[in-house]
């Protein structure tokens, strides 16, 4: 290691002496030893040398009275190990107390010298002798251990492996106080170049402190040349030595030294704080290292601690820390050092020039030799210098260094055994450093990714923060624009800066949104997707669902947590008229057609779905947001029952038992699952029909909207209509009144009810699918032909036998007169109903007729002639919440497609739990989905005819509002012009005796014209 400190000395000190000048007459003779301990110490040469070093000045000079109390000199033994002579001068400098030891315990021995001097002055011989005996017999304690020699004398063993600190270290403290930063840097540079250095001071304590303190700043290197902290008068010729030296001279001896030929000597006068040097050593050092060192020294000039020593340590690491790159490691060979590799680490500049000179320095060679000896012997090393290299950027992460670490760990020679047996601190330090830096690197990467995610997405997507983050509200951002600026991303997509994200409700994982505030639940398994500019454009209004999220998220409805869903109303702030609370009821999963085609389901599951009143005041966005509540609302449950393809699949394997809810017209265009050639959907409808994920908010993109076709205007919200029932038995055959009430509460909304119209054997091929199936047992009253005709967009022939008839139930309820959109030619019944918008024009295009292959017998029987056209084939557009206007049908075999789907009237209701009349809500926005396409209506028609006899309703009934009358089925009538209703209404108002059934009391011509103009 190059250290000149002896390791593990035998005793704490070698000898204690009291030296004084004997007075013989009027002249002073040479100093003599007055007393010593131990008394049997026999090295007379050492004793004679001690007497001369105890008075390193001219005693008769004028500066003798100014000599300090304590100082230290150094003697070098035959092994080049240093022995420190700690001295204390008495008043007047007539006597000196000295302890000679191999241990550099400056503060400890200075304290002991004061105690011994006090004992001598007071003539306390017993205490004096006891203290010296105890100290001499004391085994060398470990660093940091407290030692109690007597009642009044104790000390703590200093640790030479630690950096010296201020003010604990006396030498560094006095050196830093006496010399300014610039002179310290110049002296440091001169020592690195191993110049001949003289330090002059009039105070011995300060002089020796500057010598010891400046030499300590070379750590982990040591001064390898002449080292004399204080030079006695008889050795002044050393100042003319040609080799490098570091010598301290008392000011009283400097006059004689000046008369010597001092060539190329650096002289530092501590008293005047001046430095004389013929060299330009400081400027030749790398400027960046010296600048950093100077700045650090200035910063710690007024602070305590090891800041000064650490500043020099960092400079040493910057200069020599790359020595690891020059270590050559060969298998079965000792580790060597390559000077060429050490110098070539830097290509050019002052650092390379300095390293070229450094390879010739004795202190550097001794340092490298000491490191190699420790490596090859397997002892290893661990000191603050290696830790500083590890913590700093001094080529500590190079490949050669890691190879060196691997060699040290795996073993090179005796290294492996040493690591296993001794667990040396060097390996612990290296391992701890690597482990700590790995942790720091991982944390830094996580923090950067987290910051990037916050900057780009405005939310955190990491597993460290699973709780929702509440973003600033629009009001807060309006008051403080910096909140909005902080969320602006810095990324650039396709050459354009992405605009600031608007205040939209982001779709969290929990689907719980609180009053316009954006919440985001982090998910490490499903991070937020990185959207391109095209996708981010749709985020201007609403968030969309990516196909990757559709694939990752499970199919099927997942109920929201009841405690959160019940307390949060998503649409309350958006739609003021919403008054529906989310019920806390368990939801069943959707069933596929294969599950419901079983005969046992046809016979054992009575009843039907109850179609609750749907608040049509909600816009498309409201409907889609309501569906995002994991289908906790009864309305959203009706949307989740497999209405996805609007057609019977030709392959049972395609139909999934858990289908995503199809919110028609409320999601972006995404690819559908494959359909066969005989699929009912047209290509245009297939492109426009999405498959969103249940429990997600899917809103159409602005660029995905299509212009509505001519004459296609979505109908407005209407009153709750009656359901189309498939009778469970012959006409007029009712088993009980509750059974009739259950049948009246059926909702033709789910394709799961199509099983009532399907036979036992499920048709597999496309040809068999279009064949009229035979009625299943227990479903004699089902309309198979009506179903197949509705599912065929090219079919225009409707047989009279396929018109389902409804039993006439005698009811004494108060007659309710709903509105009628297109009045039939025959005398209408007082129970027919019309939507609020009677002007939904349709293009009178008659597609080619495509009759069914066979027409079975009429399953419903012949309806009575007195029954009106109330039960013509009518469609309930369950997936959109709108009802098509009713069309009278005089000839079912030649019926045009727009007139195929008429208005469904009020059904036979005897339950007092069903609400009457239209909901008092605002009209919804105009949909952009072409709902009037015949194929789309045909696909939705299957839901209106699906009814199994005896099936119980899955949803609770509505609260009772009023009684509903039982509408009577009517005979088919002629189709009317859409504008004929307005003319007829006008005539009825002018006529003195208007028909009471056609002119409801709550409807006028002005209302019809106003509503017609609204949707024009």
UniProtKB/Swiss-Prot annotation:
GO terms for molecular function: guanyl-nucleotide exchange factor activity; phosphatidylinositol phosphate binding; phosphatidylinositol-3-phosphate binding; SH3 domain binding; small GTPase binding. Transmembrane segments: none annotated. The modification Phosphothreonine is found at residue 519. InterPro entries: cDENN_dom, dDENN_dom, DENN_C, DENND1A/B/C, Tripartite_DENN, uDENN_dom. Residues 13-145 form the uDENN domain. Guanine nucleotide exchange factor (GEF) regulating clathrin-mediated endocytosis through RAB35 activation. Promotes the exchange of GDP to GTP, converting inactive GDP-bound RAB35 into its active GTP-bound form. Regulates clathrin-mediated endocytosis of synaptic vesicles and mediates exit from early endosomes. Binds phosphatidylinositol-phosphates (PtdInsPs), with some preference for PtdIns(3)P. Interacts with RAB35. Interacts with clathrin and with the adapter protein complex 2, AP-2. Interacts with ITSN1 and SH3GL2. Interacts (when phosphorylated) with YWHAE. This is DENN domain-containing protein 1A. It comes from Mus musculus (Mouse).
